[in-house]
A protein has these predicted regions:
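Glycine-rich beta-alpha junction loops
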Residues: 5, 9, 32, 54, ...
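Substrate-binding/catalytic subdomain of NAD(P)-dependent oxidoreductase enzymes
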Residues: 47-59
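Active-site/ligand-binding loops adjacent to catalytic centers
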Residues: 1-46, 92-118
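Catalytic phosphate/nucleotide-handling subdomain of diverse soluble enzymes
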Residues: 58-118
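Generic beta-strand/beta-sheet core signal
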Residues: 28, 49-51, 78-80
Length: 118
């Protein structure tokens, strides 16, 4: 999902990379995402777009795994843009007004069933 990028689906290239096991998809909740975005901003001086924060959080997770195991690897992620038009979201995060939200499996299935009937 990349809501701010106005695309709510999986791209063809990403889907093929997943199918070929050349990459993996991970679930990042928004609080972890914004935490990683703030860490990146402090370290690099760039406020990342919220969409990029998910990738940053995944990179941080991977770096922490390497730190624990002693493994050395190159970790690459895509910074899709700056977050200067998303400062209100950062304000909400820093004020403690954001929360993680996850749809229940039943709700997802209900919506998928409704799409099938269109």
């Amino acid at each position: 999902h990349a809501g701010g990028l106005r695309y709510h689906g999986a791209g063809v290239i990403v889907s093929q990379l997943l199918k070929d096991n050349l990459m993996e998809a991970v679930d990042i909740q928004q609080l972890e995402s914004f935490e990683a975005g703030c860490l990146f901003a402090q370290a690099e001086g760039i406020i990342p777009a919220p969409e990029s924060c998910h990738a940053i959080a995944a990179a941080v997770r991977e770096a922490e795994k390497c730190k624990e195991t002693g493994e050395e690897k190159v970790i690459l992620f895509n910074l899709s843009g700056h977050g200067l038009i998303d400062m209100a979201s950062y304000d909400q995060y820093l004020a403690g007004n954001l929360m993680n939200y996850e749809l229940k499996d039943e709700d997802i299935q209900k919506n998928l069933d409704e799409i099938k009937n269109m």
